[in-house]
C-alpha cells in the first residue's frame, strides 16, 4: 500500500472507533425490548378495534409488562379502562383511568372518546378527582 492509502485507512478506522461509542440518546433510551412492547401495544389496539376485547386486554397488559415508554403506558391504561367500562367493571375502569392520569395528568380523551356514553363520564369524574398539577 502507498502512504496515502495507509493514512486513509488509519483515518477511517479512527473515525469508526470514535463513532462506535456515539449512539444517539434516542437509541440509548429505546432498547429493543421497548420496540417489542410498542409492537405488542399496537397489536392489542388492533385487537380492541376488531372487538376481541379479552385477547386485546391480555396483549395490552403484556405490553405494559414488556416495558412501554411512559407515554405508551398511559395509552395502554386508557385502552384497558375502555375495556373494563365496556365489560361493566366500573371500579377497574376507574382504576385504569386513574393510572392513566397518574402517568400523564394532562391527558384528555379525543372528542370521539370523551363523548362515549359509558367511559366518557367515568373519565371526566376520575380526572376531576385527581389533584391539580
What is each stretch, according to the model?
Residues 16-37:
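Bacterial Sec signal peptide processing site at the extreme N-terminus
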Residues 70-73, 103-118:
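Boundary/linker segments of alpha-helical solenoid repeat arrays
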Amino acid at each position: 500500500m502507498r502512504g496515502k492509502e495507509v493514512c486513509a485507512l488509519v483515518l477511517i478506522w479512527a473515525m469508526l472507533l470514535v463513532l462506535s461509542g456515539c449512539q444517539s440518546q434516542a437509541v440509548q433510551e429505546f432498547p429493543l425490548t421497548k420496540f417489542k412492547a410498542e409492537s405488542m401495544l399496537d397489536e392489542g389496539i388492533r385487537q380492541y378495534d376488531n372487538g376481541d376485547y379479552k385477547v386485546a386486554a391480555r396483549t395490552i397488559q403484556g405490553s405494559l409488562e414488556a416495558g412501554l415508554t411512559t407515554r405508551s403506558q398511559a395509552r395502554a391504561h386508557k385502552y384497558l379502562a375502555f375495556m373494563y367500562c365496556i365489560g361493566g367493571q366500573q371500579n377497574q375502569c376507574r382504576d385504569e383511568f386513574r393510572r392513566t392520569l397518574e402517568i400523564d395528568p394532562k391527558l384528555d380523551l379525543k372528542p370521539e372518546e370523551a363523548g362515549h356514553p359509558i367511559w366518557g363520564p367515568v373519565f371526566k369524574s376520575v380526572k376531576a378527582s385527581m389533584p391539580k398539577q
